[in-house]
């Protein structure tokens, strides 16, 4: 038996670079505790500097 694929409390999200639009990182987020979108300063390998990464959908 497999797991159900529904909208649970913890979801998998992608972090998208604001300058390039590339999905560089994936992480999990508890949707009940943090309802707003994540915004983190992360390293972008294509630009070779730290840029703002925002939460996006995983395709």
From Swiss-Prot:
The keyword Ribosomal protein applies. Gene3D superfamilies: Ribosomal protein L33. GO terms for molecular function: structural constituent of ribosome. Keywords: Ribonucleoprotein, Ribosomal protein. One of its GO terms (biological process) is translation. One of its GO terms (cellular component) is ribosome. InterPro entries: Ribosomal_bL33 (IPR001705), Ribosomal_bL33_CS (IPR018264), Ribosomal_bL33_sf (IPR038584), Ribosomal_zn-bd (IPR011332). Belongs to the bacterial ribosomal protein bL33 family. PANTHER family: 50S RIBOSOMAL PROTEIN L33, CHLOROPLASTIC, LARGE RIBOSOMAL SUBUNIT PROTEIN BL33C. This is Large ribosomal subunit protein bL33. The lineage of its organism: Bacteria, Pseudomonadati, Spirochaetota, Spirochaetia, Spirochaetales.
